[in-house]
């Protein structure tokens, strides 16, 4: 079974982000290693959402990669520059050097993709 390291946020309300990634990748026979980049009370399109501070995606991913190698890496929503920097460092690391890498622009394309 191939392993995929998934960086994305998770929301308590709103079936999107990590909640949508896991069943899709699992259906395709991949072993999922989810790494939350942010934890929200609800999807950010709802008014009044709140976010848990200081989600350490980089440290979380390093622990997972110490036990299992990644054949692929999926990068979804990163809510701040520190998280994006940690993910970038991991993508450059030897632990993910040979892994396929997929980056989802999460609407960063202004609707042009």
Model-predicted regions and their roles:
Residues 1-71:
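Small-residue (G/A/S/T)-rich helix-start motifs and N-terminal tracts that mark the onset
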Residues 72-113:
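Conserved beta-alpha-beta core of the PfkB/ribokinase-like small-molecule kinase fold
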């Amino acid at each position: 079974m191939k392993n995929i390291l998934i960086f994305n946020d998770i929301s308590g309300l709103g079936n999107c982000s990590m909640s949508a990634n896991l069943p899709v990748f699992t259906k395709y026979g991949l072993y999922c290693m989810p790494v939350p980049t942010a934890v929200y009370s609800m999807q950010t399109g709802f008014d009044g959402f709140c976010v848990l501070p200081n989600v350490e995606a980089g440290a979380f991913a390093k622990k997972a990669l110490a036990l299992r190698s990644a054949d692929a890496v999926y990068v979804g929503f990163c809510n701040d520059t520190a998280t994006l920097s940690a993910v970038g460092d991991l993508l450059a690391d030897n632990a993910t050097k040979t892994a396929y890498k997929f980056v989802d622009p999460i609407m960063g394309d202004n609707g042009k993709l």
